[in-house]
């Protein structure tokens, strides 16, 4: 087959004209682009030169003139750059022209194919029409292409110009002022301040912070950073400013703490100095007392020595008399059993000597005893002892004391007790002690002189037994007055010692309160740490399960808690339970007490009744309605009678308290509160109104606290049960993966959970019981107080109703009306039927059973006891003032 010659490409004149126009347009466009770029570069260079001239303060053109050492090299470099740019542009233009030529060749092929031999006139007409359309559309498409190319070139030129500007902008030297302030001799930069220097010197820290902020502001003022970088620099500047402010606040707080510390130190030093001075004075007093006692012991020793000498002399005289008469044996027997009339002269002598020898240790015992025996007590003791069989010496001494107090001279001893009432502490410690010592010495000298006279008098044989008794009674009168004087001084010393003991007890109580607070804070930290661990455990358990082996290791490492740790937690939980202590008793005077009924405020006259379960044991701090200070009910107020102020004591047995349970809905409490808040309409005294208002507000707050405790208890219970269920699931997974040996730790963990649950739930139960007791006492106080207000002051307040914890089955309506009693003392509901009145009791019992069922359910089952629904026809005030949904909200709040 003969090969056909390829068709020759024939370019029409119109196409050639279009190509020429395109080339001319491209040349003009390239020239314009080059001129615009050169002008932009020149403008940018001028702008940079002007900016640096403004900032640096000198002209760059002068430096350029001085630095024009090699202008030819610079011109050559610029020329080479221009030639390279022109060559790049020429290559790009050649490439573009080649693409256009190829595109035009394709168009020529299509046009030659279309211009081929025409078959018919219709095809020729269609072809002509297509050519006309192409002639119209082609310039438009070329124009659109030109515009697109122009927009692309403009966009690329802006990007290229920005890049060129960034590359052409010379690197700016920042922080010249900071560098100028730094010493030029040191090669390194200035070192920043250490944290200790910042805390010590506030002025230096402020200057350094201002320097850093000014440096960051200089960065912000420059235009060489992008928006993101500027935002980051601004963030750093704000952080530095905030740190500076925080340090300033810390400085202020440190100064305030230093001033407080100095003030407390001064107070402590003053207190210690005063205590030291007081202790020194007290020691001086004790030393003076010791010296006085030592002196008294010396005097008594000398007297005892004299008495021994007198005893020997008397024995010698007695032996001499016995030898003279020759009847020594008979006289000895008679003197032991019953003295005869011949020996009555010698016996009083021995009796007086023995009496005085025994009175001295008795006086010593009285001096060192805390409270001396009264004269009447000594008379009774002397009478009782003299009646029995005792030795001769003791009988004689007691009989003489009885004779002394039985005589008429005892009337002179009774007024001595009167000055004991005036017990005031002396301002100076030395004067009373010196006076007391002087009086002691004088009294002892008088007493010893009189004792010596008495002994000499009894040694003589001229007086009878009656005269000797009279002399001894007169000589004993003044020592008793001395004893009373000493007793007065001893009472003063005892009172001073009691005062110091009270102060020491007070300091011990304050120290114990501080220790209790520290222990409570430690327990709170421990509870927070345990709660944080529980939250971390829950988060870890919510994460996707890992492989069995890794899961067992994680359980051993995270879930397992040693038994010792749980024992510590048990102790902490037991310590968190409120128990009566000395700190609580000390704080009871400062805590606001709940109002109590008049029966609890007034004790009985005989025996004080024991504390019942209704009385408060622990009184939490509660919010109250602001009222004026109350007046005591025991003091009469002007304008009121005493009969209205004194309330009769209400004696309630524990059996009656257990049987009666009072209830009052929130609507009635709100009505009472509204009625009591209206002062103008009520004519109650202020103390009665404040007491009733306090009872009402306390009852409402206790209801809210009961609901809060119940919700907290239930939340804690559900959390522990969910944690327990998760542990059980882990145990099952380990059993399935045949890793049961690793489940032992989880079993220990489950035991610890059960132990902790029992402890915490018991603590919450105790709190709930305490609130219930307070609530019952408030309601019983209302039942006691409100009817009396209604009777005496005509104030009609809603009274709590009496409900039975174990109500009997409701009888039919045909029952006799005598079995139906009113629910309150003065509150009656005659419009309700008997059957309908028994329904709330059944509902209350059913709701209590349902709550017990809720607490006894397991998490896995989540089933509740099925009970009979509450009929919808009952009003809400019969259902304790609230609907039956949800079951948890069974409290009247």
From Swiss-Prot:
Its cellular-component GO annotations read: protein-containing complex
Q: Which residues cross the membrane?
A: none
Q: Which UniProt keywords apply?
A: Coiled coil
Listed Basic and acidic residues bias regions: 342-353
Q: Has keyword Repeat?
A: no
- Domain of life here? Eukaryota
The region called Disordered is annotated at 177-207, 327-376, 537-557, 574-611, 806-827
Q: Answer whether the UniProt record assigns the keyword Cell inner membrane to this protein.
A: no
> Where does this protein have compositionally biased stretches of type Polar residues?
179-188, 197-207
Pfam families assigned: FAM186A-B_C, FAM186A-B_N
**Residues in coiled coil:** 303-331
Q: Which PANTHER family match?
A: GLUTENIN, HIGH MOLECULAR WEIGHT SUBUNIT PW212-RELATED PROTEIN, PROTEIN FAM186B
Please state which protein family the record places this protein in: Belongs to the FAM186 family.
Q: What is this protein called?
A: Protein FAM186B
Organism classification: Eukaryota, Metazoa, Chordata, Craniata, Vertebrata
Tell me what gene encodes this: FAM186B
């Amino acid at each position: 087959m003969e090969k056909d010659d390829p068709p020759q490409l024939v370019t029409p004149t119109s196409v050639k004209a279009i190509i020429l126009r395109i080339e001319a347009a491209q040349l003009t466009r390239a020239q314009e682009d080059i001129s615009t770029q050169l002008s932009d570069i020149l403008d940018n260079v001028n702008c940079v030169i002007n900016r640096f001239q403004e900032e640096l303060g000198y002209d760059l053109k002068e430096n350029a003139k001085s630095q024009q050492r090699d202008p030819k090299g610079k011109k050559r470099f610029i020329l080479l750059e221009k030639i390279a740019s022109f060559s790049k542009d020429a290559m790009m233009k050649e490439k573009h022209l080649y693409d256009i030529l190829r595109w035009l060749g394709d168009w020529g092929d299509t046009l030659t194919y279309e211009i081929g031999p025409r078959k018919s006139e219709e095809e020729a007409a269609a072809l002509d029409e297509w050519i006309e359309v192409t002639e119209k559309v082609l310039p438009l498409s070329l124009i659109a292409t030109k515009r697109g190319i122009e927009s692309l070139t403009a966009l690329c030129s802006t990007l290229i110009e920005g890049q060129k500007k960034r590359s052409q902008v010379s690197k700016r030297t920042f922080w010249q002022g900071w560098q100028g302030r730094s010493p030029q001799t040191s090669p390194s930069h200035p070192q920043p301040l250490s944290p200790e220097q910042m805390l010590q010197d506030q002025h230096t820290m402020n200057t350094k912070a201002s320097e850093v902020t000014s440096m960051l502001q200089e960065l912000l003022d420059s235009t060489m950073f992008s928006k993101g970088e500027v935002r980051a620099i601004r963030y750093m500047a704000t952080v530095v400013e905030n740190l500076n402010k925080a340090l300033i606040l810390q400085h202020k707080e440190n100064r305030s703490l230093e001033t407080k510390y100095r003030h407390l130190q001064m107070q402590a030093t003053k207190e210690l100095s005063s205590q030291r001075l007081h202790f020194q004075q007290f020691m001086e007093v004790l030393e003076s007392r010791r010296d006085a006692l030592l002196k008294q012991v010396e005097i008594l020793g000398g007297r005892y020595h004299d008495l021994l000498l007198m005893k020997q002399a008397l024995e010698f005289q007695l032996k001499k008399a016995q030898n003279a008469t020759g009847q020594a044996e008979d006289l000895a027997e008679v003197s032991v059993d019953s003295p005869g009339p011949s020996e009555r002269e010698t016996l009083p002598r021995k009796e007086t000597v023995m009496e005085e020898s025994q009175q001295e240790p008795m006086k010593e015992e009285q001096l060192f005893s805390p409270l001396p025996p009264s004269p009447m007590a000594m008379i009774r003791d002397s009478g009782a002892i003299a009646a029995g069989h005792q030795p001769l010496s003791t009988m004689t001494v007691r009989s003489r004391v009885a004779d002394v107090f039985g005589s008429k001279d005892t009337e002179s001893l009774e007024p001595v007790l009167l000055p004991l009432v005036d017990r005031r502490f002396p301002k100076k410690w030395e004067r009373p002690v010196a006076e007391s010592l002087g009086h002691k010495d004088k009294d002892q000298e008088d007493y010893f002189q009189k004792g010596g006279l008495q002994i000499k008098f009894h040694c003589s044989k001229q007086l009878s037994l009656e005269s000797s008794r009279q002399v001894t009674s007169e000589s004993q009168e003044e020592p008793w007055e001395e004893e009373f004087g000493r007793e007065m001084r001893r009472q003063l010393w005892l009172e001073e010692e009691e005062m110091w003991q009270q102060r020491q007890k007070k300091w011990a109580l304050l120290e114990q309160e501080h220790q209790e607070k520290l222990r409570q804070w430690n327990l709170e930290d421990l509870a927070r740490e345990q709660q944080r661990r529980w939250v971390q455990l829950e988060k870890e358990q919510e994460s996707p399960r890992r492989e069995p082996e890794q899961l067992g290791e994680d359980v051993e490492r995270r879930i397992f808690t040693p038994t010792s740790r749980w024992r510590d937690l048990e102790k902490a939980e037991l310590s968190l339970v409120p128990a009566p202590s000395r700190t609580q008793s000390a704080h009871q005077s400062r805590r606001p007490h709940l109002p109590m009924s008049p029966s609890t405020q007034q004790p009985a006259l005989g025996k004080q009744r024991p504390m019942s379960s209704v009385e408060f044991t622990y009184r939490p701090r509660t919010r109250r309605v602001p009222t004026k200070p109350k007046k005591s009910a025991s003091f009469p107020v002007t304008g009121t009678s005493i009969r209205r102020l004194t309330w009769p004591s209400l004696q309630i047995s524990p059996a009656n308290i257990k049987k009666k349970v009072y209830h009052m809905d929130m609507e009635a409490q709100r009505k009472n509160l509204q009625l009591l808040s209206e002062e103008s309409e009520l004519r109650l005294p202020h103390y009665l109104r404040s007491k009733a208002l306090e009872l009402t507000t306390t009852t409402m707050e206790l209801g809210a606290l009961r609901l809060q405790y119940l919700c907290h208890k239930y939340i804690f219970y559900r959390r522990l049960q969910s944690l327990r269920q998760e542990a059980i699931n882990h145990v099952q997974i380990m059993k399935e993966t045949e890793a049961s040996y690793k489940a032992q730790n989880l079993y220990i963990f489950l035991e610890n959970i059960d132990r902790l649950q029992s402890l915490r739930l018991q603590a919450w139960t105790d709190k709930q019981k305490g609130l219930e007791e307070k609530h019952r006492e408030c309601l019983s106080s209302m039942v006691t107080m409100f009817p009396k207000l209604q009777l005496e002051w005509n104030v009609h307040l809603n009274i709590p109703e009496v409900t039975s914890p174990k109500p009997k089955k409701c009888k039919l309506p045909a029952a006799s009306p005598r079995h139906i009693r009113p629910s309150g003392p003065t509150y009656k509901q005659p419009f309700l039927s008997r059957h309908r009145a028994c329904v709330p009791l059944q509902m209350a019992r059913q709701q209590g059973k349902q709550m017990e069922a809720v607490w006894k359910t397991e998490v896995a089952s989540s089933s509740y006891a099925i009970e009979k629904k509450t009929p919808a026809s009952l009003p809400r005030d019969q259902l304790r003032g609230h609907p039956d949904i949800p079951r948890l909200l069974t409290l009247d709040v």
